[in-house]
Amino acid sequence: MKYDLIIIGSGSVGAAAGYYATRAGLKVLMTDAHMPPHQQGSHHGDTRLIRHAYGEGEKYVPLVLRAQTLWDELSTHNEEPIFVRSGVVNLGPADSAFLANVARSAQQWQLNVERLDATALMTRWPEIRVPDNYIGLFEADSGFLRSELAITTWLRLAREAGCAQLFNSPVSHIHHDDNGVTIETSEGCYHASKALISAGTWVKALVPELPVQPVRKVFAWFKADGRYSTKNRFPAFTGEMPNGDQYYGFPAENDELKIGKHNGGQLIQAPEERKPFAAVASDGAEAFPFLRNVLPGIGGCLHGAACTYDNSPDEDFIIDTLPGHENTLVITGLSGHGFKFAPVLGEIAADFALGKTPSFDLTPFRLSRFSQ
């Protein structure tokens, strides 16, 4: 059987692409080396932030606004909401370049963002402590996503729509010819007119020339009481320290508050190098500088997990066809800030398989930027 689209890697982007392409009437085969959702990539750990006024650059705002529409639609397919509108407060020095980008994005796209000085911040959320030179930019319409629930939902909807799914079966080789794309797996060879490579951290095992660096990252859950929960209107957050370190976190659930450090981590070259949480001496203490100074009421570390970022050289996404192979789209280099975009990236992949022109300017995400 010849498929219209083969998806290599069915984590966040691949799961979304499988659903949207199948829903559009295409014959789709989804593949994955493991059984998604799983612990081997970048989507586990239950929750991910979604921010609209984007500190990483205005070019992302149209994408994330479309993603939000798709998240809202996906949430209707579950009794438990996939998106929780907790609000997100971005904390940092008043002269922070990241916060300047947030403010600029909000102004350009007329987004609901409130600026609070240090006193106003600590009055609204007495649990937060910041220096006098800090500000907060609060996005009331943003919040967090339940990442594994989202992937489970996409997989179920795709399967119900007739999508073929081949999991626990790594792709070993990709071949291109005039008739399309052929993949080799432990279960045999499969052929399609087009392919999406959304293999996450270890994409270079299939496409060695891609400029992607795997980075081992950790996040952890700390003891917290009801003051830090959504019931008390405590928001999700990002926080920039005076030395430039960037943290992110979520409202407490079941008396546990999850937090991670966005920058840093350990460069790795193979899956076995992604050691479990606490295998690196600094893991348990990584969040201490932020907690001690900004959230001093949080208790000790309860447990943690390791994941991986697939970093591009500039930490912007890679969304492009493979050089010389216009029938193969690669989406990678999401650099630790990609999950919130998964539905719109999946929709872009489905449009690619349908032969449609993208609805967004994807020029900033082309591979050619690295050869200029």
Curated annotation (Swiss-Prot):
Cofactor note: Binds 1 FAD per subunit.
Molecular-function GO terms, alphabetical: flavin adenine dinucleotide binding; N-methyl-L-amino-acid oxidase activity; sarcosine oxidase activity
Gene3D superfamilies: D-Amino Acid Oxidase, subunit A, domain 2 (3.30.9.10), FAD/NAD(P)-binding domain (3.50.50.60)
EC id: 1.5.3.-
Record's keyword terms, sorted: FAD, Flavoprotein, Oxidoreductase
Chain positions recorded as FAD binding sites: 4-34
Needed cofactors: FAD
Family per similarity comment: Belongs to the MSOX/MTOX family. MTOX subfamily.
PANTHER family in the cross-refs: FAD DEPENDENT OXIDOREDUCTASE DOMAIN-CONTAINING PROTEIN, PEROXISOMAL SARCOSINE OXIDASE
Stated name of the protein: N-methyl-L-tryptophan oxidase
Organism encoding this protein: Salmonella typhimurium (strain LT2 / SGSC1412 / ATCC 700720)
Species lineage: Bacteria, Pseudomonadati, Pseudomonadota, Gammaproteobacteria, Enterobacterales
